[in-house]
From Swiss-Prot:
Task performed by this protein: Functions in the N-end rule pathway of protein degradation where it conjugates Leu, Phe and, less efficiently, Met from aminoacyl-tRNAs to the N-termini of proteins containing an N-terminal arginine or lysine.
Catalytic activity field: N-terminal L-lysyl-[protein] + L-leucyl-tRNA(Leu) = N-terminal L-leucyl-L-lysyl-[protein] + tRNA(Leu) + H(+); N-terminal L-arginyl-[protein] + L-leucyl-tRNA(Leu) = N-terminal L-leucyl-L-arginyl-[protein] + tRNA(Leu) + H(+); L-phenylalanyl-tRNA(Phe) + an N-terminal L-alpha-aminoacyl-[protein] = an N-terminal L-phenylalanyl-L-alpha-aminoacyl-[protein] + tRNA(Phe)
Gene: aat
Keywords: Acyltransferase, Cytoplasm, Transferase
Matches recorded under Gene3D superfamilies: Leucyl/phenylalanyl-tRNA-protein transferase, C-terminal domain, Leucyl/phenylalanyl-tRNA-protein transferase, N-terminal domain
GO molecular function, one term: leucyl-tRNA--protein transferase activity
Protein name (record): Leucyl/phenylalanyl-tRNA--protein transferase
InterPro entries (UniProt xref): Acyl_CoA_acyltransferase, Leu/Phe-tRNA_Trfase, Leu/Phe-tRNA_Trfase_C, Leu/Phe-tRNA_Trfase_N
EC numbers on record: 2.3.2.6
HAMAP family: Leu_Phe_trans (MF_00688)
One of the GO BP terms on file: protein catabolic process
Primary localization: cytoplasm
Subcellular location: Cytoplasm
């Protein structure tokens, strides 16, 4: 049975209570209060829903992750990086990045990054929890992504691209930055060909929970300069 959350309690059900079909649906309801969002990521779940639906909380099994040391950069992408076609920045324009990620796409109906979702993550950004990566070309924002940093873990949320390889360049730059700072895992949530081409792979929900337990409160070993 699906658990419905109240607005006065930030506790989530155990991850092993998530449904098998649809895969990983753990709970519904609640709100997007920053304290609840932080509690959700610490617990191992994330919000994902469409306009008109209640807030749905997910913990899929398996979970798609990328270990920084397993980052794969193809020859063509390495060439693009060497050519320095793009400028990459951190936290320069979080709002523009999340709005671009929320924009309609040809291959999808609607967006799950609703206006309340955008406002909630902007608040997390103001609190220093959520971060953005911007990719610029000739002064124009052409790619980027955003996510949350907790302990030695980074939780990726969404990315966008308006130029060939722009989001990949932003992602690779972020992964290298996190690796140098001592991060051990990047949560990619759900599988995509794009992410698998960069080295992402699936691990069990149990293994993901082990990473959470071990690293969510452990400070990075290096300097993280967002």
């Amino acid at each position: 049975m699906l658990t419905w959350l109240s607005r006065t309690n930030y506790d989530f059900p155990p991850l092993d209570k998530a449904l098998q079909e649809p895969n990983g649906l753990l709970a519904a309801g609640g709100d997007l209060d920053p304290r609840r969002l932080i509690a959700a990521y610490r617990h191992g779940c994330f919000p994902w829903y469409q306009d008109g639906q209640p807030i749905l909380w997910w913990s899929p099994d398996p979970r798609t992750v990328l270990l920084p040391e397993e980052l794969h950069v193809s020859r063509s992408l390495a060439k693009c990086l060497r050519q320095q076609r793009f400028e990459v920045t951190f936290n320069r324009d979080f709002r523009a990045v999340i709005q671009a990620c929320a924009a309609p796409r040809d291959y999808a109906d609607g967006t799950w990054i609703t206006t309340p979702m955008q406002l909630a993550y902007q608040e997390l950004h103001l609190r220093g929890v959520a971060h953005s990566v911007e990719v610029w070309q000739a002064g124009q924002l052409v790619g980027g992504l955003y996510g949350l940093a907790m302990g030695r873990l980074f939780f990726g949320e969404s990315m966008f691209s308006r130029a060939d390889n722009a989001s990949k360049v932003g992602f690779v730059t972020l992964v290298r930055h996190l690796r140098d700072a001592g991060f051990v895992l990047i949560d990619c949530q759900m599988p995509t060909r794009h992410l698998h081409s960069l080295g992402a792979r699936a691990i069990s929900r149990e293994a993901f929970a082990d990473y959470l337990q071990r690293y969510r409160d452990e400070s990075p070993s290096g300097t993280l300069d967002f």
